[in-house]
């Protein structure tokens, strides 16, 4: 049986996150995308310390779609190197699993 998978990413702003999220949900690659605007980031980029405003994103999908979700994010994302972190939950509520798997059929 497939396992649930959370994908953490960031977007330059709320609208970009919602637009990419809607495309991923419509393609049945993810069941849901949560986007939190107003995040402040400090990060190292090409040898410099940068600051910026971003929106955090948390995607809910199944592990079997990992590579397709990653490819779709990279293709749609405006960042040169988008952050894509896979988080494997140790468990989930049965109803939550049924919902995620029902919304993201094996492809």
Q: Which residue ranges define each predicted feature?
A:
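Positively charged, small/polar-rich N-terminal and surface patches that mediate targeting and assembly
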Residues: 1-107
């Amino acid at each position: 049986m497939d396992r649930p998978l959370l994908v953490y990413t960031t977007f330059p702003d709320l609208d970009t996150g919602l637009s990419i999220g809607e495309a991923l949900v419509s393609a049945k690659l993810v069941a849901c995308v949560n986007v939190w605007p107003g995040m402040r980031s400090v990060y190292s980029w090409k040898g410099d310390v940068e600051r910026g405003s971003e929106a955090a994103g948390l995607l809910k999908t199944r592990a079997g779609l990992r590579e397709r979700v990653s490819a779709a994010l990279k293709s749609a994302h405006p960042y040169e190197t988008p952050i894509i972190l896979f988080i494997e939950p140790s468990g989930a509520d049965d109803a939550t699993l049924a919902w995620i798997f029902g919304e993201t059929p094996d492809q």
